[in-house]
Amino acid sequence: MKFKALVIDIDGTITCKNRELHLGAVKKMRTLNVPVVLATGNILCYARTASRLIGLGGAVIAENGGAVTVRYDVNGIFEGSLEECEKAFSFLSQHFKLTKLDPTYRKTEIALRRDFDLEEARSLLETQPFDIELVDTKYAIHIKSIKINKGIGLQKLAGMMGFEAEDFVAIGDSANDAEMFEAAGFGIAVANGDERVKEVANYVTEASFGDGAVEAIEFLESNGWI
């Protein structure tokens, strides 16, 4: 079993508990001889900047799969629109005081501060005809289309890179990484990961956060899989 590329989440996976980049994970990624793609719920310009500063090739999945690009100098491709998300936001705003995060730069979803009752909001949304879901990444709550996720983003980006999604190993920690694990050929959850992502993972590390990412990569190398 040999994989051709790696796709890895940022926050909670290649960071420390305080959200600083884990230098050991950064160094480990830079030693690999396969393409490394960053996948995040954050905005495209953030993902691109992180890729560049880490020293990777610029291929990223952003906005939970809603935005992808293969290089720094190639325009991002966006899937879906904000129209349905805005309708859901307007509806929920009648019940909660909501604060948008990075609204100027988000093109395919709405990210909210985590200061309202998520389960109550989900129950309220079920009464409406929106094809929308609320996803908690532990750093923000995202109003997003049910037709967009990191797995779909990986399939799109893999094709743009000349690969299949199954050619990738995926590493992550949050519930929004689950579809990416299912699309990839192999999924590794770090120890601090959500139960949802651990359930679909092929391997769960003993270490957490960036230490877990290092452990994951070393596990793959020791088996000759990358």
UniProtKB/Swiss-Prot annotation:
Record-listed Mg(2+) binding positions: 9, 11, 173, 177
GO molecular function, one term: phosphoglycolate phosphatase activity
Record keyword Cell wall biogenesis/degradation present: no
Function: Catalyzes the dephosphorylation of 2-phosphoglycolate.
Cofactors required: Mg(2+)
Enzyme Commission number: 3.1.3.18
Top-rank lineage group of the source organism: Archaea
Active site location: 9 (nucleophile)
Positions bound to substrate: 150
Catalytic activity: 2-phosphoglycolate + H2O = glycolate + phosphate
NCBIfam families: HAD-SF-IIB, Pglycolate_arch, PRK01158.1, SPP-subfamily
Keywords: Carbohydrate metabolism, Hydrolase, Magnesium, Metal-binding
Entry keyword annotation includes Plastid: no
Protein name: Phosphoglycolate phosphatase
GO cellular component: cytosol
InterPro entries: HAD-like_sf, HAD-SF_hydro_IIB, HAD_sf, PGPase
Species assigned in the record: Methanosarcina mazei (strain ATCC BAA-159 / DSM 3647 / Goe1 / Go1 / JCM 11833 / OCM 88) (Methanosarcina frisia)
Family assignment from sequence similarity: Belongs to the archaeal SPP-like hydrolase family.
